[in-house]
Amino acid sequence: KTLLISPWGTAPRVTLDDTGAPRTWVYRTCFTDAFQGSALAKFAAAYMKATKAAVLYNPASEAPKSQAELLKKEFEGRGGQVVAFETYAAGDKDFSAQWKRIAEAAPDVVFLPSYYGEIPEQIRQARAAGVKAPFLGSDTWTNSELLKSAAEVDGAFFCAHYNPDAMEDKVGIFRGAYENRYDKEVPDDGAALTYDTLYLLKQALETATSDDREAVREAFSKISSFDGVTGRIVFKGGAPDPVKSVVIKQFKAGKISFVTNIDPD
C-alpha cells in the first residue's frame, strides 16, 4: 500500500484496476487521453468551425486509440461529421492509401494523434496526396523536436498541459528557477506536471494526521483543488483523475505559440 501519483500518465487505465474500478492508492495530476480527445473535438468544432473531420491513428497504441475514439464521439455529438477514420500499424512507412482516401473525403481538419517521430513524414505524405486541411494533434506533439520539421508542422494545432508564457506568478517563478538551474532551458510539460505533483504531495504531507501511509493517502484524497503551474487542478469527490483545462498551441513560423485554453464543460 503505497500512494502513487502519476504526473504524466494520460492512459485511462492508469487509475483503474482490472475491473474498471478506481484504484484506491493511485492518482494523476494530468488530464486523461479521453479528456483531451473531448477537448480537441470542442476546439475543432467551436474554434476552428470545422464540420468535417478525418482521423488517422494506430489502434494498437492505447493513447492514440482512446483519443481518436473520444474525438470522434465528441465531434459527432457536436453536430460534426467524421468523414474518414483511418488506421495504420506500428512500423508502417507508407500511408499514401489512407491519405488518398482522406483527401477525397475533403475534411476541414485532420486529427493525427501520432508520436512525434512519426508526424513529419506522415504530414509530408498527406500533403503529397492532396490533403489541404490543417492538422490537429494530441499532447504527443508537445516535443520540441518537431520544430526541426517546421515546414511540415507549420499551422498545426495541438494540445498541451501548460503554457510556459502564462503571466501567473507561479508560472514565472517556476520557469525562472528552472531556467537558472538548467542553462536557460524552458521547462516542458513533463517538468511542469512533476512540479505540481510534488507540491500536491507536499500539501498532503503537511495536512496528514501522521506520516503513516494510510494517513497520507487519506490527506491526498481530501484535496479538492490546487492552483499549480499547469492551472487549476480539481479533484471531484476524491476522484483519482483531475478536472482541468487543456492548453491549445500552434506551430507557427518556426515557433510554438499559445492559442487558447479549453475549459471543462
Residue ranges and their predicted role:
Residues 1, 20-22, 47-49, 103-105, ...:
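Extracellular/periplasmic catalytic domains that process cell-envelope and extracellular macromolecules
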Residues 1-4, 64-159:
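Extracellular/periplasmic bilobed ligand-binding domains
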Residues 38, 42, 46, 65, ...:
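Solvent-exposed, polar/charged alpha-helical surfaces in well-ordered, non-transmembrane soluble domains
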Residues 11, 23, 123-195, 206-211, ...:
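Extracellular/periplasmic periplasmic-binding protein-like sensory domains
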Residues 8-14, 28-37, 57-67, 85-95, ...:
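Hinge/beta->alpha junction and helix N-cap segments in small-molecule ligand-binding domains
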Residues 18-87, 109, 201:
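An alpha-beta-alpha
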Residues 178-192, 202-258:
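Segments of small-molecule ligand-sensing domains
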Residues 8, 44-48, 57, 71, ...:
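Sec/Tat-exported extracytoplasmic proteins
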